[in-house]
Amino acid sequence: MASILGVETLQHTNGTTAATIDSTGRILTPARPAFHARYSSSGTEGVQGDIVFNEEDFDIGSNYDTSNGRFTASVAGIYYFCFEGLSAGSSGGGVLADGASTEVCFHKNGSQGAWSSRTYIYTQGASNYITASVVDIIQLAASDYIQVNVNSNYIYSDASGNYDPTFQGFLIG
């Protein structure tokens, strides 16, 4: 004897929709927050402190704010974040001097926690630009925010758009 279970909507225990099944049998889930932002400048420069990535390539859920550089979680969960850019030695975008360093990290709710991944770049033997990259998987409650912070030296950007630092992230689950 065959049994048929007719389901159109799956709900979380708090009553929010987890998934729906359309008339063709496809399972549809609510959009998951995801974004990709970049820092774009009109000239050659170095940026420091909390970085405000002023252009968005996409922002599913409208969680990234180009006015303050923060991704604010609208949904509690586990998130993946990534930053990439070139380190610079001055606010004018100059190369890192021999023996100089740059530190880049994620700040959660305005501070760097013990959990936070960071990259610490140190030049030795030559003045140059060096790629900086930070990746982390972070648990956020709804309304927690993440931003990128450069603690020492600078991150490089120029008007060509070829060297725009980027910040991206998405909800894993």
Model-predicted segments: where are they?
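Extracellular jelly-roll beta-sandwich "head" domains, especially the C-terminal globular C1q domain
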Residues: L5, T13-T16, I27-G173
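Acidic surface patches and DE-rich sequence motifs
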Residues: H12, D22
